[in-house]
Amino acid sequence: MGLRFVLGRSGSGKSTYILDEIKKEAQKNETTSIILLVPEQYTFEAENRVSKLFLGKEKDKYLRVRVLSFKTLSNIVFSQVGGLTDVNINSSGKAMMVYRAIEDVSEELNVFSKSKSQSGFVSSITDMISEMKQYNISPEMLENISGELDNETLSLKLKDISKIYNSFEGKLHENYVDAQDMLTSLTSKIELSSYLDGACVYIDEFTGFTPNQYNVIKSILNKSKSVNISLTVDDINYIGYSKSDMFSRTKFTYSKLTQLCNEEGIKILPQVNLNTGVIKRFEKVKELQHLERFYNAYPYKIYSNPTENIKIKEFNNLYSEVEEIAREIVHLVRDKNVRYRDITIATRDLNRYDFLVHSIFNEYNIPNFIDKKREAKSNPIVILIISALEMKNRRYGYETMFRYLKSGLIGIDNDDINLLENYVLANGIKGKKWFDEKWDYRITQSLSGQESEFELELKEKINEIKNRVLEPIVILQEKLRGKNRVKEICRYIYEFLLDINMPETIESLIVNFKDKGELDVANQYSQVWDIVVDILDQMVELMGDEIISLEKFIKLITLGFDEYELGLVPPSIDQVLVSSVDRMKNPDTKYLYLVGTTDGVFPLITKDSGILSDNDRESLGNKGIEVDIDSKTRSFEEQFLVYKALTSTSKNLTITYPISDHEGKTLRPSIIISRLKKIFPNIENKSYLVEENKNTDKDILKKITVKSPTFNELINVIKNYDSDGYNTEEINSIWLDIYRYYLKDEIYSSITKKVIKGLSYTNQVHKIEEKKIRSLYKSNSLSISRLEKYAECPFAYFIQYGLKAKKRKEYSFTPPDLGTFIHNILDRFSKELLQDNLTWRDIDEKYIELKIGIIVDEIILKIPGYILNSSERYKYLAYRLKNMLTTAITIISQQIKQGSFEPIDYEVKFGDNGKYPPIKMVLENGQEVSLIGQIDRVDEFEEGENKYIRIIDYKSGNKSISLTEIYYGLQLQLLVYLDAILESAKDEDMNINPAAILYCRINNPIAKFNEDKDDEEIQEAILKELRMKGLVVKDSHIVKEMDKSLIDGERKNSLVIPVGLTKDGNVGKSTSAISYEDFKLLRKYVRHAIKDLCEEMLSGEIRIAPYKHKDGTSCDFCDYSAICQFDSTIKDNKYKNLNNKSNEEIIKMMKGDVN
C-alpha cells in the first residue's frame, strides 16, 4: 500500500511511463486487477493506447487491465457489493427535478424570487447543487453559514440555495441517486469490495480532483497494492506555489494528496522525476524544447537560431484561415507521407470553427472528426415533439405549426407542405381556423368575380393536405385537454409518435444516411430516438402520478432535452482530430494547428458570473467552506491550458489567427503571438491578408490539392486573366495542363466547359426569339399599366408577366390591397347612385356615410376570411376606412358641385368586351396590337357644339403628372384613356375637346395650422389638401367651368384643380396647364411612345435597364432585384437617367420625336 507520484513537464512522457509500467505489471503471473483511471472524455483514447500494448501472443495479458473513469469504477464496485439497483438519475432528470424543487419553494425565495422564471436559471441552480455536493456541502451547512455572514445579500442567497437544494434532495432520495451521491457511496463501498484488493492503480490525465474524488482516492489507497498518479509540474524540488503559478492547480493537487497520505498513514513512495534531461516529446525538435522551457519563464531566453518548426500565420477571416490549413494538410499527406491521425486542429472556441472546418475539410477530402457533443434539442425529432405539444398554447401559430410540418418526419411531401404554407400565410390562418371543417378562402384574394375551376381544384387539394396534417394532431390535442397525470401525457406522446409512424420513419432515415456514408448523422438520429424514449420513461419514473398542466409539462420536457448531448465515436482511425484545447487528447500529434488565437479567446478571459460571485466564494473560503475556484484563479489556470496546447505536438506547431470575424468585426492577435515573437525573433510570421499572385511553379503547385478546390483555383486564374482573349503565353503551363486534365475528366469535363463559358457572363440578358416571346406573352392585347411597367425596366416586366413570378402573398393589408379596396368601393358607390336615380349634386354627407357603411360591410362579410373582418385591429381599420371614404367622397361631391362637369361613366373599359373598342396599333413589322384599359371616371361638359372631356383616376397616394415621366413612358395611362374617349366620340356631331387628366386622391386629409381656424377655414384647408392633380387645358373659360369659384374673382387659386388665375383672369404660367395644341401633341407622342415600347417588347428585348431620377430609381421597390443583381458599379449595369427638364423643353423634345 503506497502512493507514488509520476511528475514531469508537458511532453516528458508521464503517460508513456505509466503505460510501460502497466505492461510490466501485466507480465507478472498474478490475477489482481490493473486499473488505469482517467477522466471520462479520455477513456476511448486510453483504451486504444492500452490495447496496442498487448499484441499477438501477449493479448491474454490485456484481460487483467481495465481503463476506467470514476463512473465505470462505481458500476464495477456496486455490481459486487450492491448499489446498482439504486436508480441513477441523469442530467436530464436532475434538471427536471431541480425545476420541481424551485416550484415547491418559489414562495419562500428572496434573492431569486424574480430570477426563478428566467431562462437558464434552472441550469445555473443545477450546476450550483452539483458543486455543493462535489464539495460535501449540505443544505444544513449552507443554512448555518448564512447566519454567520455580515453580507446580507450573500446570506439571503445562501438561504435560497439551501431551500432549493433541500427540496431537491428530499425529492431525489425518495427513489434515486445522482452522480455525486454515487461517488459518496463509492467511497464507503470500496471498503466492502474485493475488486481493488491488491490492485495496481494508475491515475493519469487529471490536473485536480473534487473533495468527493479525493475521498474515493483515499479508499483506493487503503485497498490497493499501489497507486501511481501522474501530475504535470515543473520544479519537483519546490512544490510550493501561488495562484499565479502556471502549475498551481497540479501543485495544489500534489499538496492535497500528500496531506491525505500523511493523515491516513499511507506511505509515499519515491517520486518518478521525468524532468531530467531533454523532454522526451521534443527531443528531435529544438524549437519545441525551447518553447516548452521558456514560454512561461521570467526572464525568458531568446532562441536566436532559425525557427522552422514553429510558424505564425495571419488571415483576413476564418474561412481563409481554415482553407489554407486544408491546403497544407493535403500537401503534408500527399508529399510528406504524413498520416491524418498525426494532425490535430485545436481552438479555444470550437463553436466558431466546427461547421467551417467540417465543410472545408470535406471539400478537400480530408477525413476529420469534430470532438464535440451535439445538442439533442436541435434534432428534428425533438423539434417535432416540442412543436406538437406547444401548438395549443401558442394558438396554432405559423411558427409552431410549420416547425412541426417542416421537420421532414410526418410523411407528407414537401411540395404539399409548401402549398399549404403559401395558403396559410396568404389567409392568416391560425388558432381555431386550422380546425374549420373546410377552408373556403379565395386563392386569388379577389374582391369580386367567380372562382375558376383551377382555384376550386387547388382549394380541394389544400383541404385534403390540411386534413392529413391535422388527423394525428387532433387526436393528440383531444387527449391533452385540461390537466393530466405525467404518465398519461407521456403515453399520449408515445401514441402520437406511433400514429405518425415515427419509429419506421427514423429507421428508414438511418438506413438512408448509412447508405450515403453519413454515419455521423445516422448515429445522431439513432441516439435521439433512444433519448426521447429515455426522457419519457424518466418522467414517468420521477413524477408519473403527478397531475400537471400542459404548460408545465412542456417546460419540464424541454429542460430534459436541453441537458442531453449526443456523444459520437470517431468513425475512423486515420483522420484529423478537430478539438477544443481543453479536450485535446491526441498523444501522437506531430502537426498541431492552433487556430483562432485571438485576444480574449485564447487565453480565454473568464468572467465573474454564476450564482456565486468571486466575492461570495472568497467570503465562504474565509469561513472555512471550500467551494470551486473563482474567475481570477480560472484566468491563471488558463495559462496552464495555453502551455498544454503549445506543448502538445512533437514535430510542428502552427499558430493562426484571423483579423476579422464572420460579421467583419476586427479581431486582435492573442498575447501568445507577441510572446512567441519575443522568444523566437526569427519565427516565420506569414501574412495572408493580401493574396500573392505569384506565378512560379512552386507557388502554383501549392494550390494544387484535390479536384474541387483545384478546379476553383483554375477558374480564378482564368477569370483574372486578360478578358480580351486567351493568351497561352501568359498563363503558366501547369494551369494549362490542369485545364486539359479537367476537360478529359468524366465528371468535370462538361462542368469545365460551362464554367469557362460562364466566365464571360454578365447579368445583362439577351433578346429572346420573337416566337418564344409571343408564346410567353400570348395575347396581343396589352394594358397600359403593363406598358408603363415595361418602360420602368424591361427585365422586371419579363419576370412578372413573362415568367409570371410572384412575391409570396402574406396575410396583411398592403398599399395595393388598399388601392383595390378603394376602387371597388367607389365603383359600387357610383353605380348605386345611378340605381337610386341620384347624381353627385343630390347627395350629402349623411347619405354618403350611410351608403359607404353598407357597401363596406357587404364586402367584408361576403368574402370568407377577409382580412378586414379577421380581428379587432382590422375591424377598427375597416371603421377608419369608412370614415376616410366618407370624407373623400364628400370632397368628390363638393368638387363636382363646384363646377359644370358631370360624371357620365365609371370603371369604363376599353377592350374586346368593354364599352369602347381597344386601341388598335399596327407596328412596323405589320403586327397589330390592341391596347386595353379601364378608366375610373369620365366627366363631361357640353357648351353649344363643343363637348369637353375630363379623365379622373383615383389614387390613394399623393401622385401628380410629370411631362418628364410621360416622355419616358412612365405615365401613359391617363393620356391613352383621354385619347380613347376622344377617338371613340369623334364621329359625333359635336366638337370633342380635352379638358383635363387628373388624379383624385382618396385619403384622410391632414391639414396643418399655425393658429386657430374656424370651420370654414378648416374646410377650405381640407379641400386644398385633397385638390386634384394633373394637367388642365390652358383655357380660362373651361377652367372656371371646373371651379365656378374662380368666375367672380372670389379666389385666384382653385380648390378643385391645380390651376390659378392671374389678375386679368388668364391661366397662370406656374400652374399645371397646357394648350389644346400641346394636349394634341401629347396624345400623338403617347401613341408614338407606345408603338416604340410595343415593338421593343415584342422583339424580345428584356434588358436590365431600370430608370433613375431625382426621387429614386425603379429598383427601390422592385420585387425582382434579387434576381437581376443590378449593380451600377458593374460593367454594363447603367441606369436609364430621366433628365429633369422644364415642361417647355419636354414639349420641344416631343415635337422633335413625332415630326
Swiss-Prot record:
Gene3D superfamilies referenced in this protein's UniProt entry, alphabetically: 3.90.320.10, P-loop containing nucleotide triphosphate hydrolases (3.40.50.300)
Cofactor binding annotation: Binds 1 [4Fe-4S] cluster.
Residue positions binding [4Fe-4S] cluster: 793, 1115, 1118, 1124
GO MF, any single term: 4 iron, 4 sulfur cluster binding
Keywords: 4Fe-4S, ATP-binding, DNA damage, DNA repair, DNA-binding, Exonuclease, Helicase, Hydrolase, Iron, Iron-sulfur, Metal-binding, Nuclease, Nucleotide-binding
InterPro entries: ADDB_N (IPR049035), DNA_helicase_suAddB (IPR014140), P-loop_NTPase (IPR027417), PDDEXK-like_dom_sf (IPR011604), PDDEXK_AddAB-type (IPR038726)
Domain of life where this protein originates: Bacteria
E.C. code: 3.1.-.-
Entry's Gene Ontology BP terms: double-strand break repair via homologous recombination
4Fe-4S keyword on record: yes
Additional detail: Despite having conserved helicase domains, this subunit does not have helicase activity.
Subunit text: Heterodimer of AddA and AddB.
Primary role: The heterodimer acts as both an ATP-dependent DNA helicase and an ATP-dependent, dual-direction single-stranded exonuclease. Recognizes the chi site generating a DNA molecule suitable for the initiation of homologous recombination. The AddB subunit has 5' -> 3' nuclease activity but not helicase activity.
Protein name per the record: ATP-dependent helicase/deoxyribonuclease subunit B
Species this protein is from: Clostridioides difficile (strain 630) (Peptoclostridium difficile)
Source taxonomy: Bacteria, Bacillati, Bacillota, Clostridia, Peptostreptococcales
